[in-house]
Amino acid sequence: MLDLAPLWISLRIATIATVVTFFVGIATAHFMHHYRGRGRALLDSIFLAPMVLPPTVLGFLLLILLGKNGPLGFLFTNAGISVVFTWYAAVITATVVALPLMYKTTLGAFEQIDSNLQQAARTLGASELTVFRRITLPLALPGLIAGATLAFARALGEFGATLMLAGNIPGRTQTLPMAIYFAVEGGDFREASIWTGVILTVALGGLVSVNRWQPQGRRLAKREGKKEDLMLVSAQENAQETDGPEKLERPDRLRHYASMLRPAHAPTLSVTLTKHLPNFTLDVSFSADEQPLGLLGGSGAGKSMILRCLAGIETPDAGRIVLNGRVLFDSEAGINVPICDRNIGILFQNYALFPHLTIAQNVAFGLHQKLPPEQIQEIVTQQLSAVHLEAFAERYPHELSGGQQQRVALARALASQPEVLLLDEPFSALDTHLRDQIERQLIDRLQDYQGVTLLVTHNLDEAYRVCHQLLVLDGGTTIAHGPKHNIFEHPQTVSVAQLTGCKNISPALTHGPNQIEARHWQCVLQTVEPVSSNLTQIGIRAHQINLQTYPQASSAPNTFPCWLATTSETPHGMTLYLKLHRPPTNERDYHLQAEVFKDKWSSLKDQPLPWTVYLDPLRLILLEAD
């Protein structure tokens, strides 16, 4: 009769080793995921060494370590514990050989998690333990299960190291691989075949189950999402465009909740920070109040870095951040409030919704867990109602469109009533029609929001419509800060003019108190404002150039003949490239860019050249050096 002892011994050893490996592997992977020291490569190699070393070499090293004269074996012997040639020696070898698989698989799962998800959880008030428990582990779960399965299969099949450390003692340390080996050695191929089939069934069965479980779960979620999409999405999107009483009443439902958390004094944010980056040094100082502040600048100017420093995701090298009288960061005093304690909400570019949580759970994530469940449910319902998504409460983020995800992210950020709301290019992933809708809804939400708002955007129109104040950055430094009207209508420097969309700029020379020469345009211009001694250039915006087809007296100020060099068409207008004084020699030979609507272009295009261009003195922008 077949002795089943090797099967039970193998299952017991592999199970215990897998349990130990599971927790040790997760802890090791979590440590290595955050460790960035110089010894990272060495530590990683040590953890992976059992996977590449020959089993006999590994067994010999363990024998030296745990033998009677070994450093650990000596301690065990003095304590009356003998490790070698016992069943728990087999557990040790199985754990050592299985650990690399669990560690590497788990580390890969951790590295695939979008770091913005963890940062979003921290900004919503979650501690590191909460982030690990509610975000990291659930998102890494498929990898953890795969790693545990591989570890179990490896522990079940361990032979060489186990033979050297635990020996082959029937009924005590003889595992399935050893039973197979000695059965073949004794000529009992029937027993060897049976045990081989058992190992194949157990090991491959577990791997197949894991491989089938993961895609099946994803397909199920997608199918259920698509079932309701046909009925709910179109109805919900249509409801957003209606202007009935329900739409007007929904924001009112939040007023009572918002009034309870309204600050006693007007919110204030004071920021002075310096951070050294690879290409430049971010050095800014500004303040903000309840009126939204827009951050404008080219790519890499430091706009998003400012938000990350405010939220606590990045640490400035020097500076001070004070919010409503509370110091969040002070390099001199050594103060750096953790992310979870800053009460700052941030809307990431990719929205950073937690994919394993429903929409309602996402919105409720930042609410204090000590609140009564009824109050949490009420707040979640109010927030989703305000963004017209209450019907989607039990759905998951991947079942929503980009615009719906953006609104959920905004509702989640506002649910806990943060003192500061940071918006990092919130409309960048939306199409034009949806962008306009979401922008209007954002403006409506901000009217009831009683905190400080900072908006990062590359879109000038967005910044102008949403924000009252603007902060213009170039190369990490502030080049303009003030009301949006002043910055757009009276930019002081060339960089500010260019960043606010001025396309016509020319070096200038002063000819008198109200007269300058535009050197590139080869003309003398009259100005309304007195010319400053610091004047270096002059500009005019493309849409403010006045074009006429009838000739005017050449003595009229700022009036010149012009010829059309080439055109560029947009959906609703035309950009005209104009050469002053004489016809152009080629398409690139032009002085000015003028933008006109297509109805204006229809009346211009058939008129004979030259046309007349008028540069209104009120529209001229007098610029100083940066």
Where are these regions (language model features)?
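A short, proline-enriched helix->beta-strand linker immediately N-terminal to the Walker B motif
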Residues: 415-419
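Conserved ABC ATPase signature
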Residues: 396-400, 404
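Non-catalytic connector elements of ABC transporters
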Residues: 265, 271-317, 321-322, 326-327, ...
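ABC ATPase NBD coupling module
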Residues: 328-345, 369, 487, 491
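Conserved ABC ATPase "signature" region
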Residues: 127-129, 326-331, 374-392, 444
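Interhelical loop and adjacent transmembrane-helix boundary motif
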Residues: 1-5, 165-204, 208
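ABC ATPase "signature
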Residues: 478-482, 490
